Amino acid sequence: MPHPLSLAHLSLIASPPEDLIRIAALAGFDLVDLRLSPATPTDRVYDDKERISLCRALLPLLQGNGLAVWDVEIIRLGDDTDPERHLPLMEAASLLGARRLKVVCDSDDPAQAATLLARLAELAAPFGLTLDLEYMIFSGVKSLGAALAVNRAAAQSNLKVLVDALHWMRAGDSMADIRAAPAGSLGYVQLCDGHLKAPWGHDALIREARTDRRAPGDGEFPLKDLLDVMPEGCVASVEVPLRPGGDPLMHARHLHEAARRITDLGENAS
């Protein structure tokens, strides 16, 4: 079963949602991920009313370009997070017809993380949203095993784990770890490539994740093998930031072609 391809907003983070949608459609993507809540201090910040107005304006653009929104990001969970504060983001995601909402956990307390995530999932359920917990070596939830444990403790049916190829590699997770994950516990995969050797230090790992990813096939990651152990036909979101001075459309087209070559390898082998 083919993997639908989505263009992650980080790939063209300087492009507003309107441009991202047009470019994703021209490049051949099936889906798009939209960053409507900041993940970093430099990201665009929308107030709640502005975000809803934007989403209403995006609906005809999505329809006209034959695209759907797969994922809206991002919710960052810290020890003092009020889950109810994220209801407006859930409303916006639902308005767009998004199916997923991405969550990153900054809490180092697994019990607190599970409590917050459980409440967040309860709030998201009436909107028809599944929450994907993305683990990162430099976040509070650092590995696939840790993410699965937090979700298991949260005990909500609309929780999944997002496997980002870069974070999977940097966490030292294996194919066997993914195979051993309980059925239905994994959501989708984010594709990028990179060096096998990790950069040294916390700041360097963050910098790599935000600015120094490579297109699928342009590095040393075992992406075809990764896709083989992920759920059949799961969405593959391509997350590779545009380098300074690059052309957004050319970049998106390159990412689509590169990702499709990797996914086609998996399909032809099955």
Residue spans of the language-model regions?
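N-terminal small/glycine-rich loop or linker at the start of catalytic domains
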Residues: M1-S6, N65-E73
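Active-site acidic/histidine proton-transfer and metal-coordination neighborhood
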Residues: L61-A68, R76-V161, R170, M250, ...
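Glycine-rich, proline-tolerant flexible connector loops at the mouths of alpha/beta enzymes
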Residues: D33-A57
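Histidine-acidic metal/acid-base catalytic patches
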Residues: M1-S6, A14-D30, L87, E91-G97, ...
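Residue-level preference for long, well-ordered alpha-helices that form the structural scaffold
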Residues: D47, R51-L54, D82, D109, ...
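Hydrophobic residues within beta-strands of alpha/beta enzymes
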Residues: V32-D33, W70-V72, L101-V103, L131, ...
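Active-site beta-loop-alpha junctions enriched in small/polar residues
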Residues: A8-L12, R35-A39, I74-L77, V104-D108, ...
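Surface-exposed, active-site-proximal loop segments in enzymatic domains
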Residues: T40-K49, I75-M90, A204-R210
